[in-house]
Amino acid sequence: MSQTEVVRRALIREARPEDDAAIGELLVEAFISQYAKKMPEVIYTDERKRALRDVASKRAVASVLVAEVDGEVAGTVALFPPGAPDSQAWMPNAADLRHLATAVRYHGQGLSRPLLDATEALARKWAVDAVALHVRKGNAGVARMYMQRGYARAPEGDLVLPTVSLEAYLLRLVD
């Protein structure tokens, strides 16, 4: 299936409880396989895998979207509203974009584009000032993808945690 065909056939919709297991496995597979290739020093603990698989908790506080292709969950993203528990947005009235991933078999086929389009449209519907996100330090390809969409580096939102350093990016929706 061509990239254009995959994107054309993708249905972007709100995740449902019956999607939770598929989303959780997709996140674990996508993050581990991609980081294992691009950043071999990254190690995912069992605790991190459990957190990625806990989609029900995310749906309770955030809008979780999926890209469905031929009845299969092929991609996902979560958008946390301002002030939501677990939000990592560092500025007021900003939504927090997290967990953008596509199934490994769909990598490089453009599925992130419609997922991000839908997420950014939802943020505008919420009337937030910006969409905030974090990228693992050193993940230049992912950072470049966001910058090509208009996200700008925002060092004031960087997070340095015991197990990871994250660089902040911001898409301003209002001037």
Language-model segments: residues:
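Short acidic N-proximal helix/loop "leader" segments that mark the beginning
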Residues: 1-6
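Conserved glycine-rich acetyl-CoA-binding loop
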Residues: 99-117, 124-126, 137-144, 148-149
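C-terminal "cap" of GNAT-fold acetyltransferases
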Residues: 16, 29, 93-95, 129-149, ...
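Acetyl-CoA-dependent GNAT
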Residues: 10, 14-20, 24-104, 116-118, ...
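A generic structural signal for short
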Residues: 43, 107-108, 130-131
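Solvent-exposed, flexible loop/coil residues
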Residues: 47-48, 110, 163
